[in-house]
Amino acid sequence: DDTNAPLCLCDEPGILGRKEFVSDATKTIIEKAVEEVAKEGGVSGRGFSLFSHHPVFRECGKYECRTVRPEHSRCYNFPPFIHFKSECPVSTRDCEPVFGYTAAGEFRVIVQAPRAGFRQCVWQHKCRYGSNNCGFNGRCTQQRSVVRLVTFNLEKNGFLCETFRTCCGCPCRSF
């Protein structure tokens, strides 16, 4: 396994390449802020998010772990893919990013507040290289897609809805 491959989001460096970590103090601040949002919302009906009254969470809360599915973060529909001859094998797993770089390249703390009941999951689609599905002259390439995640701005002590890139699918390209 490539330890420097993204753990969740396309532009997130792997363990060896990480320069930023989210401290416990920051996690506590976020938990408290999310708990406040949950309190404002009161009791939630079945199937409704505790957070849907908050504009940022309403716009951006689609990746809540309890409701997200792998197909939500695929770049395209399931096989057969019309625009690619074939697809390399893909391993999917859900992943909870705690930080990332936005589509504009800015470092952000992504909201994960398990105690308050709000966790965000994206599905990571990793190509299994070394497959012969691409024939002898092709190679697996990764598509990119965007997801909108709830982030926390420590300076302003507020939530934002921001765009991140995820990798998904592994089409074959002949080069």
UniProtKB/Swiss-Prot annotation:
Keywords: Disulfide bond, Hemolymph clotting, Secreted. InterPro entries: Coagulin, Cystine-knot_cytokine. Hemolymph. It is found in: Secreted. The keyword Secreted applies. One of its GO terms (biological process) is hemolymph coagulation. One of its GO terms (cellular component) is extracellular region. Disulfide bonds join 8-167, 10-95, 60-161, 65-121, 75-168, 88-140, 127-170, 134-172. Belongs to the coagulin family. Coagulogen is cleaved after Arg-18 and Arg-46 by a clotting enzyme contained in the hemocyte and activated by a bacterial endotoxin (lipopolysaccharide). This cleavage releases the peptide C and leaves 2 chains of coagulin, A and B, linked by two disulfide bonds. Coagulin molecules interlink to form a gel. Coagulogen is a gel-forming protein of hemolymph; it hinders the spread of invaders by immobilizing them. This is Coagulogen. It comes from Tachypleus gigas (Southeast Asian horseshoe crab).
